[in-house]
Structures are given as structure tokens and as C-alpha cells.
Design a protein with these regions (language model features):
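Hydrophobic or amphipathic alpha-helical targeting/insertion segments
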Residues: 91-106, 110, 122-126, 130-133
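Cap/lid segment of the alpha/beta-hydrolase catalytic domain
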Residues: 141, 191, 357-482, 489, ...
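Non-catalytic accessory segments flanking enzyme active sites
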Residues: 27-30, 36, 43, 50-51, ...
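Multi-bladed beta-propeller domains
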Residues: 1-25, 57-79, 104-120, 150-172, ...
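Active-site-proximal cap/loop segments of hydrolase catalytic domains
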Residues: 440-657
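Hydrophobic beta-strand positions that form the internal "hydrophobic ladder"
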Residues: 39, 91, 133, 183, ...
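A flexible loop/linker signature enriched in serine peptidases of the S9 family
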Residues: 43-52, 72-78, 93-101, 115-121, ...
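Residue-level detector of Asp-centered blade-edge/turn motifs that repeat once per structural unit
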Residues: 33-35, 86-88, 127-129, 178-179, ...
């Protein structure tokens, strides 16, 4: 029989150390074009989170190809992605320390092929007719904003990249046609983000390798075009949201034709480079992934019939779709399984798990599977979320007691809740804390209209949806309405602080590298996001009053609930001063506050020790504020101005009286 213990105090086999050190983080994925294709991918491994390059030939196990002192990662746009390119037997990667391109062989050490200090590279494509790379570059040598453009790099020459296209603020997805005569790419300008409005271009490649006869194919200030790819027979395909959802199109005879029209997104917001959702098995067959409110699905699309046929795979989170003539490889995850590198044989349906993000299984008896909910929110709208109820076969809560709720506001804010198994969520549900992962208005995966609910309303719509989601579950009787909490990172951290400053629903908050001062963020953040707030809040200086009204730093008087903050001191996306100003203001206002800062961490913690310490500090903070005693041995966290409520095991601090 299960023991009866208060929610939050259940003992769990899912420890903070397991969450921090038990999983690797897959990044880029590539597939060879042979009959039995080779797979290559990058993976960040604990404890340091350094990205290793892994190579897996057919009928062999994976082996590390690039390891320390290298770290396979690009910092273009700060978020990176597209640090790997496999072109036949050639493997190229970007090294984090110097941001230069290297080439590596099966039995040879990496060799640097660029000598361009102060420049970063990403999202390369191979021009086999000219034996060169065409790559997105970001030049940080001058004063002011870095300069983005497309460069050509000849691996055998080394040295200086040559600019072949420039003049726009941003570039992505250069792709050479199969016959080598044309180049396609995407560009956009301030103040747009690529999911707001972007343009797809093609140009002829002249004999000397320069670009001529540029032609705009699609895109506008109100149309987002992403992921250009050439079919084997030379037709340009892409994804556009011109009809309200990111759907597949092609460009034939100088006309744009829809390939699939449905209320589903065949792309995700391109925060990072080179995360494709489709590819070609042949000129007549596309393998793709798309998302609805029920999660991601894999499918086959006939380019002649324009018919979509679902492919049954046991995953609801699908990324990095890479296609060869008889195979598709992808990153797949579900609520029951952590992310894997999977390979599917298209003719037989044989599915092979090539690599796992974590070794060893979590006992399924301790896993909480999410329920998809749609709940009423402000202005007659509905919003979406994933509900995880407490699950632990060893315990149940006391009769009449309901569990506390942990509401999660995802980052971005133009992003979405993951459908893969997340030990960071199971850590809480296995201890008796319910979780609501909110896809608030502005999230991706529900079409352009849902994304644009946040236009001009960041700090309002997202907050209202988190508040109303929590209220919905409390009124339904699922959770304890007096123990509602909220957690968020980055943009989600801003949502946390706004929810605490402008509403009285949540008992406490957890803020990871969150935004507290919108004007400061607009002034200090990096180029890629430097005009993001124009759409989310309004243009400066015209809307300076709105920035002030929405910034939690100016509303400390309304924020009287305990908050714990976490910050990486090398964060260039949300600089540390955003957290430090808020912590200082709350301390002066005598609001209960705790703050943990981490040397060497950037935007999104990567080191296992950091992740473990932060998660344990959260649990300690929850116990002190909500009044339960965690079963874990926990290092104490200094909490300023928290009225004493006794101590619990592992707490070495002196409670305030």
C-alpha cells in the first residue's frame, strides 16, 4: 500500500543529479546518401555540456569523431545551430572557441579551413561544382552591430572567406541547386524576426562563382518563408505561412504552387539554423514532420498527387528530419521516452534507435504522461497546455489535500512546450507537485494567428494565459488554489515576474535568466533579438511609456511574493544586470528573495553541476515557501526576508523570526 505523505514531500528515484547528469542533448543531425546511409550528429554531454561530433556508419555502432579540446557549436545569432555539414566523405564543423570552420576525416585530426578572426559561421551548404562551402557569416570586427552575409569558403585554399551576398540584416539557409547553377537563400531585415516576415531569393551562379540575376520567389513583411530545399530534379521547395499556417510550397515555371494546405505547421520558429522538417526521398516523395495541438507527426507527401500519408512512429516530438533515398533519420521523443536518434527504413517500415539521449530507463511507474487541455482565457479566447499530474506508486496525498501546481511559461516567447519526456518535469510530479506547461497565446504550433496574439501584448497575453490556466485547474479541483506557483526562463522569466507583479494568483515564482527591464533589454541584447520587442511591445521611443508600464523592475511595490532567481554570468542574450537589478530592488523592498549566479554559464545552463544545484535550490525554496519538507538532503539557500517557518532536514540556515 502506498504511504500517505504530503504532496511535495514524496521520495523519488528521479534525483536532481539524474536530471542534470543523466541526459545528453542532441543538436545537428546529418544523413549520408548511400543505400545504407551513415549518420552524423552533435551531442552535448554532461558534466560540462561540451558538444561532441559522433559518426555512425551503417551496421556499426556510434563512435566519437571530434572530442575535446573541440566543442562543436556556432554562436551566429547567439543561439547557433547549423554547426555541422556532411558533404559526401567530407565533414565540416564549427568550433566554439574560435568560431572557425574545420574539416575532419575518419582517421585524421580536425584541420582548420578558415582563418577569419572575429567572424562566426553557420548553416553551410556544399557547392560541389566549385568545391567550396557557401555559409552564413557574422562579422563582429567592427563597431556597432555585427554584419551578416553569405560567404564562400574554399577548404583547400584556407584563409579569407569571400562575400558573395550582403546588404540585408540577416541571412539563412543558403542552398545550391543539384545542377550547381543556382543558389537559394532566405533573408530578412530589422525589425522583423524570421517568423514575422522574410524573403526567399534565388540567383544564378556565374562562372566565376558570383551571383547574378537575383529573383525574389516569395515572402513579405507579413509572410514568413523558411527552409528552402531543392528536389533532386531541381525544383525549389519551401515552407510559407501565407495562408495562416506554415505549409509546403514549390516554385515551378516562375510560379508558386501550394503542395499541402492544412491547418498544421510544417515548421517551427527558426531560433536556430538548420533544423529541417522535411527532405526528399525522391523527386516524387517528400518525408516531412508537422505539428498540431496533439503534437508532432511524421508523414509522406507525394509531389505529383499532393497527398499526405501519415507514417506511424512512436514519437510526438520530432526534429532534425534528414532524408535519403530509402531512409529518414530524425530526433524523436515522446512523453514515455527521452529523445533518441532514430532511423526509419521507408520501404519496410523498420525503425531503429541509433542513439539515446540517456542510458538506462526510468521506471514507467514514476512517469507522468501529459494530458492536452484547452482552457478559457481573456477576450473570449482559449489557450493550450500540457497537464502533468503527480505520479509515484509509493505515495499518495492525504485525504482532502490537493497538490501544489507548478505553472511553466516557456521561453521565446515565440516557441512551444516540448512533447518529449522531460526529467525536469518528472522530478516534480514524482514528488507530488502537479505541472502545467502552458502554450500561451504567441506560442508556435497553432498557426500564425495564434502566434500573433502576442503582437504588442507581451507581458499581458502570456501572463493572462498562465494565470487563467492555473485558475482553471484550481477551479476544476485538480490542484490546491492556495499553492499555485510559476516558473520560467528567459522570456518565460519575464512572464513569471509580470504574473507576480500584476496578479495575486501565484504564491511564489522561479525566474531563470529572466527579463525585468524591457528598455534595458532593447538596449543591451544582441543583434538577432535587438528589434524583437518592436513587435512584442512596440517601437521605441514612441512606446516608451508601454515599456515602463510592462517592466517588472518598475513595479516592485506590487510584487510581494517570494522569488528565487538563477543567472549565468556570461549571458549575452539576457544580461546579468536584468536579474541583479531586480534582486536588489526586491531586497530593498524586503520581499523574500534568493539569488544564485553561476560563473561560466551563458543563456541556458549546460553544466551538470549548475543544473543539479539550481534544481535542488528550487526544491528547497518550494519547501520553505509552501510549507512541506522535501525528502531529499538539500543544501540550504540564503533567502532574504522570508519569515521563519522552521527548518527541515539538510537546512543549515537560521530561520528569520
Amino acid at each position: 500500500m502506498p504511504d500517505i505523505r504530503p504532496y511535495g514531500s514524496w521520495a523519488s528515484p528521479i534525483s536532481a543529479a539524474l536530471v542534470a547528469g543523466g541526459s545528453s542533448r542532441f543538436g545537428d543531425l546529418a544523413i549520408g546518401m548511400g543505400h545504407a546511409p551513415t549518420l552524423t550528429w552533435t551531442v552535448g554531454r554532461p558534466p560540462a555540456g561540451r558538444n561532441v561530433l559522433v559518426h555512425c556508419p551503417p551496421d556499426e555502432g556510434p563512435r566519437d569523431l571530434v572530442v575535446e579540446p573541440f566543442n562543436v557549436r556556432t554562436r551566429v545569432h547567439e543561439y547557433g545551430g547549423g554547426a555541422l555539414l556532411v558533404a559526401g566523405s567530407r565533414i565540416f564543423f564549427v568550433n566554439d572557441d574560435d568560431q572557425q570552420i574545420y574539416q575532419v576525416g575518419m582517421d585524421s585530426a580536425p584541420v582548420r579551413v578558415t582563418d577569419a578572426p572575429g567572424r562566426r559561421f553557420a548553416d553551410a551548404t556544399w557547392d560541389r561544382y566549385r568545391q567550396r562551402l557557401i555559409v552564413v557569416s557574422e562579422d563582429h570586427r567592427g563597431a556597432g552591430e555585427p554584419i551578416n552575409r553569405l560567404d564562400a569558403v574554399w577548404p583547400t585554399r584556407g584563409g579569407e572567406p569571400i562575400a558573395i551576398e550582403g546588404g540585408k540584416d540577416f541571412y539563412a539557409s543558403p542552398r545550391v541547386s543539384p545542377d550547381g547553377t543556382s543558389l537559394a537563400w532566405v533573408s530578412w531585415n530589422h525589425p522583423n524576426m524570421p517568423w514575422d516576415g522574410s524573403d526567399l531569393w534565388i540567383a544564378r551562379i556565374a562562372r566565376d562563382g558570383t551571383l547574378t540575376h537575383r529573383e525574389k520567389v516569395a515572402g513579405s513583411l507579413q509572410e514568413s518563408v523558411v527552409q528552402p530545399e531543392w528536389s533532386p530534379d531541381g525544383l525549389l521547395h519551401f515552407v510559407s505561412d501565407r495562408t495562416g499556417f506554415w505549409n509546403l510550397y514549390r516554385f515551378r515555371a516562375h510560379r508558386v504552387e501550394p503542395l499541402i494546405s492544412m491547418s498544421a505547421d510544417f515548421a517551427r520558429p527558426p531560433w536556430t539554423f538548420a533544423n529541417p522538417t522535411y527532405g526528399f526521398a525522391s523527386s516524387e516523395q517528400i518525408i516531412c514532420a508537422y505539428v498540431t495541438r496533439d503534437g508532432w507527426r511524421l508523414a509522406s507527401v507525394g509531389t505529383r498527387t499532393r497527398r499526405l500519408d501519415p507514417i506511424d512512429v512512436p514519437y510526438t516530438q520530432i526534429e532534425q528530419v534528414r532524408v535519403a533515398p530509402r531512409h529518414v533519420a530524425f530526433l524523436g521523443g515522446s512523453s514515455a521516452a527521452a529523445t533518441v536518434v532514430a532511423r526509419l527504413r521507408l520501404d519496410t517500415g523498420q525503425l531503429t534507435v541509433v542513439a539515446r539521449s540517456r542510458e538506462g530507463d526510468i521506471d514507467p511507474a514514476y512517469v507522468s504522461h501529459p494530458a492536452t487541455i484547452e482552457f478559457p482565457t481573456t477576450n473570449g479566447h482559449t489557450a493550450h497546455g500540457l497537464v502533468y499530474v503527480p505520479v509515484n506508486p509509493d505515495y499518495r496525498g492525504p485525504v482532502g489535500e490537493r497538490p501544489p501546481l507548478r505553472v511553466i511559461g516557456h521561453g521565446g516567447p515565440t516557441d512551444a512546450a516540448s512533447r518529449a519526456l522531460q526529467l525536469a518535469i518528472q522530478f516534480w510530479t514524482s514528488r507530488g507537485v502537479a505541472v502545467l506547461d502552458v502554450d500561451y497565446g504567441g506560442s508556435s504550433g497553432y498557426g500564425r494567428g495564434y502566434r500573433e496574439r502576442l503582437r504588442g501584448s507581451w507581458g499581458i497575453v502570456d501572463v493572462d494565459d498562465c494565470v487563467n490556466g492555473a485558475r482553471y485547474l484550481a477551479e476544476r479541483g485538480d490542484v490546491d488554489g492556495d499553492r499555485l506557483t510559476i516558473r520560467g526562463g528567459s522570456a518565460g522569466g519575464f512572464t513569471v515576474l509580470c504574473a507576480l507583479a500584476f496578479h495575486d494568483v501565484f504564491r511564489m515564482g522561479v525566474c531563470y535568466y529572466g527579463v525585468s527591464d524591457l528598455e534595458g533589454l532593447a538596449r543591451d541584447t544582441h543583434k538577432f533579438e535587438s528589434r524583437y520587442l518592436d513587435a512584442l511591445v512596440g517601437r521605441l521611443p514612441e512606446h516608451a511609456a508601454r515599456y515602463h508600464e510592462r517592466s517588472p523592475i518598475h513595479h516592485v511595490s506590487g510584487l510581494d511574493r517570494p522569488v528565487i532567481f538563477f543567472q549565468g554570468l556570461e549571458d549575452r542574450v539576457v544580461p546579468p544586470n536584468q536579474t541583479e537589478f531586480m534582486v536588489d530592488a526586491l531586497r530593498r523592498a524586503k520581499v523574500p528573495v534568493a539569488y544564485l549566479a553561476f560563473e561560466g554559464e551563458q543563456h541556458g545552463f549546460r553544466r551538470a553541476d549548475t543544473i543539479r544545484r539550481a534544481l535542488e535550490a528550487e526544491l528547497y525554496f518550494y519547501g520553505r515557501v509552501l510549507g512541506f519538507e522535501p525528502s531529499d538532503e538539500l543544501e540550504s539557500v540564503p533567502i532574504a526576508h522570508l519569515p521563519g517557518s522552521g527548518t527541515f532536514r539538510g537546512d543549515n540556515s537560521t530561520p528569520r523570526r
